[in-house]
Amino acid sequence: MSAARFSIGIDLGTTNSALAYAPLAGDAAPEALPIQQWETPETVAEMPMLPSFLYLPEDALAPQLRGKVPETQAWIVGRLARRRAAEIPGRVVRSAKSWLCHHTADRDASILPWGSEDIGPDQKNLAGARLCFDPELSARGLEQPLCRLRFR
């Protein structure tokens, strides 16, 4: 195993999530890692913070999204998901940490989005929702993606 080269800070927030890194060698200041995310169904942007929202697109929208970003899954994360929460709340998971940390929550049950009648129980399983940081980090001197976060 190779020696660590970076110090990494991850904030998995209820509202926003972020990742920063700094090389262990030298005096470089930490840098926020831009996170690729959907801005609209047509555009992708890199932003320093990722809104902590998951959106399950309607069947008519899903084909427009596939193939535009590597590893696009059924669930969409970030700014587009946050925007859709106001428009179609039954298809968006928000405050997941709060729900899953509640003492009465069954963390293995398909409960999110809570109270939604817009999607079926089989679609409430978040196992397929994942966030993959930009694999082209080698351009910034990193050989591998910093991390892969999986929602289970």
Show which residues each predicted segment covers.
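Gly/Thr-rich phosphate-binding beta-strand-loop-beta motif of the actin/hexokinase/Hsp70
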Residues: 2-29
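Phosphate-binding loop and its immediate beta->loop->alpha context
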Residues: 31-152
